[in-house]
């Protein structure tokens, strides 16, 4: 968690937000989904799929890696704090499942919940931008979808996470449950 460097790419495996949406569905806080969509989200919450194979492929390649248990933004914040860097991500690049997209279509305000909720147990990792081909090979060998969502930047004052398109996506950073730092 402590070797991310300025210029590293930020990646996440699988999809983000299914865990927290599954919990919301179980507790009656999410409605308007088809039974299969609801079942998918609940299953992702109840039985997360750890990405052990991918983690093994990333040994010696990733500069920092953490599972997304506290929420994408919080866990990226842990990498930043431990590595004494900042991060800049594009929320629109964060991979979201089809059931989660359906939920977002009826309530776009849920995007902040997807980014700050937890229990996805996907891998969030950094790797040098010059290692994109090696990352692609590792991802292909592991058979897990991975998305590049941003880059590590030098921390100007305090380590933190910036979401470049938060306002355009209607993400209310004040209520998203995480600290937001700008360069």
Residues of each region from the PLM?
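Short, acidic (Asp/Glu-rich) active-site segment that either coordinates a divalent metal cofactor
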Residues: 1-56
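Glycine-/charge-enriched secondary-structure boundary and capping motifs
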Residues: 60-61, 65-183
